[in-house]
């Protein structure tokens, strides 16, 4: 088996995790108590969903996941929620005091006390796998736990499981919406370690997802639940090929191979289509070509950056539902002829496609309509650099005055780490610039298409 272990860190990671496991359970017909009436083989079995769930002798399906937070409130919601019987109590790890939005607390003082316990639990899950494929790590880099403890865990995982791939689903701070003042510090410090210790990182950004909810689902005031359900559809589409059998399967390591041209250039944009509400879906049936086009719309991107400002290096399209390879090839052919979607000149083909015959599932009472087919796109585009330059700019404004730095130094960090991390990100922006630079071609012809 090719198992995947999910690690959910901090409030964002856990709440996105809740949405994902809720969706996985619905997709596989697993009840909130872990029983699965449709599963005939008792014990492990070779069923595809065993990549994400392990099975006990009593026929209970347990997610291969760990939830970690430095304070108990968010995990207590899991402990008392609908899916409380799904998880083994040891999988839910919580501390006593939180990281207080401080990277240094999450990484050094408080995170240090809990990290060995986490690794121990992860080790138990890993021992339970026959062929561990890698880790999916969910966190946000704006807070203290997601950024600090998240980086610490990733660093330790690199030591213990060097060759296993690590896929990050990372919530980045939004341009306008901010939940804390020191977000830029935490993000820069955390990205510094994401650069080294994840193989692929998929950037998510609340503001972009708010806008999608408002625009496409007509939700005037989206809640985190609305956001997370949308994100969980993306993550479900990515992992569908591991959990179901399909026509063109895509493995986690395949993402890496196809999307990452250079080790540092591994921050991806994601988009999902169709995002339509139930009342709209009633009147339109979306073809493969239409959903493919809308996946490339800048407005569909789940991070606030405009892919028209950059060039694509590679794209991964994961279709699910009633889709045949012929339609996919036609849709991709059309995309390639569009002048607005530009690829770097050194990567002419740039498309990796996966098809899964399992149609997308929707959460009952959720916002998304039940559709016959959907597509999720993960793309590596040079425009991602916008996200970093925005955070770097905010970092510089604060760091020039050394504002708030004493909170970090007081928790055992050194000021040098700030400048080291900041230089690393400056280098990353430069890398993106060079990757997008043409081989001697001029850049004047971009104006007229839009």
UniProtKB/Swiss-Prot annotation:
Pfam families: Tubulin, Tubulin_C. It is found in: Cytoplasm, Cytoskeleton. Mg(2+) binds at residue 71. Dimer of alpha and beta chains. A typical microtubule is a hollow water-filled tube with an outer diameter of 25 nm and an inner diameter of 15 nM. Alpha-beta heterodimers associate head-to-tail to form protofilaments running lengthwise along the microtubule wall with the beta-tubulin subunit facing the microtubule plus end conferring a structural polarity. Microtubules usually have 13 protofilaments but different protofilament numbers can be found in some organisms and specialized cells. Interacts with TFCB. Residues 431-450 have a biased composition (Acidic residues). The lineage of its organism: Eukaryota, Viridiplantae, Streptophyta, Embryophyta, Tracheophyta. GO terms for molecular function: GTP binding; hydrolase activity; metal ion binding; structural constituent of cytoskeleton. PANTHER family: TUBULIN (PTHR11588). Belongs to the tubulin family. Gene3D superfamilies: Helix hairpin bin, Tubulin/FtsZ, C-terminal domain, Tubulin/FtsZ, GTPase domain. Undergoes a tyrosination/detyrosination cycle, the cyclic removal and re-addition of a C-terminal tyrosine residue by the enzymes tubulin tyrosine carboxypeptidase (TTCP) and tubulin tyrosine ligase (TTL), respectively. This is Tubulin alpha-6 chain. There are six genes coding for alpha-tubulin.
């Amino acid at each position: 088996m090719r198992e995947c272990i999910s690690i959910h860190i901090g409030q964002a990671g856990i709440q996105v995790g809740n949405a994902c496991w809720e969706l996985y359970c619905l997709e596989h017909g697993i009840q909130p108590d872990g029983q699965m009436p449709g599963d005939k083989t008792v014990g492990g079995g070779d069923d595809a969903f065993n990549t994400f769930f392990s099975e006990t002798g009593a026929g209970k399906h347990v997610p291969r996941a760990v939830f970690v937070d430095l304070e108990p409130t968010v995990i207590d919601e899991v402990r008392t929620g609908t899916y409380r019987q799904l998880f083994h109590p040891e999988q839910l790890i919580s501390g006593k005091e939180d990281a207080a939005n401080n990277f240094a607390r999450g990484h050094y003082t408080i995170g240090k006390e809990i990290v060995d316990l986490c690794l121990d639990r992860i080790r138990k899950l890993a021992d339970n796998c026959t062929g561990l494929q890698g880790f999916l790590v969910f966190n946000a880099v704006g807070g203290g736990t997601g950024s600090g403890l998240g980086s610490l865990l990733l660093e330790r995982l690199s030591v213990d499981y060097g060759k296993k791939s690590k896929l990050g689903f990372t919530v980045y701070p939004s341009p306008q919406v901010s939940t804390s003042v020191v977000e830029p510090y935490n993000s820069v410090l955390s990205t510094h370690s994401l650069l080294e210790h994840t193989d692929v990182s998929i950037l998510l950004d609340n503001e972009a997802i708010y806008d999608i909810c408002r625009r496409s689902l007509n939700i005037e005031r989206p809640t985190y639940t609305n956001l997370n359900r949308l994100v969980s559809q993306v993550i479900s589409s990515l992992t569908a090929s591991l959990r179901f059998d399909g026509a063109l399967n895509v493995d986690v390591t395949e993402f890496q191979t196809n999307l990452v041209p250079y080790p540092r250039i591994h921050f991806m944009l994601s988009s999902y289509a169709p995002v339509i509400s139930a009342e709209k879906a009633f009147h339109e049936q979306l073809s493969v070509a239409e959903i493919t086009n809308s996946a490339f719309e800048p407005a569909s991107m789940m991070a606030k950056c405009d892919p028209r400002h950059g060039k694509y290096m590679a794209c991964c399209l994961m279709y699910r539902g009633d889709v045949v390879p012929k339609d996919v090839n036609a849709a991709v052919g059309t995309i390639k002829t569009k002048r607005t979607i530009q690829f770097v000149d050194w990567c002419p083909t740039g498309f990796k496609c996966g098809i899964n015959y399992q149609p997308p599932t929707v959460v009952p009472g959720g916002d998304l309509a039940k559709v016959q087919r959907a597509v999720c796109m993960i793309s590596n585009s040079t425009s991602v650099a916008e996200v970093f330059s925005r955070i770097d700019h905010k970092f510089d404004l604060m760091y020039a005055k050394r504002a708030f730095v004493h909170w970090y130094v007081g928790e055992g960090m050194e000021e040098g780490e700030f400048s080291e991390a900041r230089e690393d990100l400056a280098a990353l922006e430069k890398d993106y610039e060079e990757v997008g630079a043409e081989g001697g071609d001029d850049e004047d012809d971009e104006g007229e298409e839009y």
